[in-house]
């Protein structure tokens, strides 16, 4: 009995030491976590303050300026060129008391016809609401398809000589995998309620009546596009059937065809046309706060999960 006491005491001391060490490690981890959380919180507050200050300075002062709104990239929901972002920016630009003219800076290959139509309609509405503020479009590299749909909502369109302009048409594309499926011995099993619900299914043979319907669908949208272009350009548009064929042209050729009004850049239009050299960017991009919140949210979630897993593992031991 006496010989076993020292061993029992040593085991107890070892367990106590191990438990204390585990608690110390756990406390250290949580301490680091809360320090990082505090740092992130303070950084977030600082970012909000900086972002608020920069927003407050937009359009500040009593000097007249040219308001610029960018339509850059694919016009689609959730993008910087989405209807929500562009329309919001246009509203702010027209609302600013120091705005002398608004320039939509286009650099887009197109996108959703629904989004483009919404932006176009808002441009026309704001122009009618603020008749004293002219609205221009300036093309950088490319203004095609839905991008041009948006541009024709402006009073005048200015391009660079080498800009790519046009593509007034509608596109629907996809792939067919039936040949590959036959080689692999894969059978397609498609069950629908509604005989046309599986129209243009890439894993089923092409049905001619589906193609006819799809062409009619695109033709309807194409006619809407043509109507918008004719409404926006009016008599400036030359009588040339190829204009609506989906072709693209250089900026210089687009002026000859009446698709654009002249050669110019953002700076030259602000200086010579609007006659307000100061350019204020009203583009509604993802803010610093939104970007930080999105990234921090993902990082914080990852840290919490990792911490929970570690603590759970310590508890099992």
Residue ranges and their predicted role:
Residues 1-137, 141-160, 171-317:
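N-terminal organellar transit peptides
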Residues 167:
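Extracytoplasmic ligand-binding site segments that recognize negatively charged/polar headgroups
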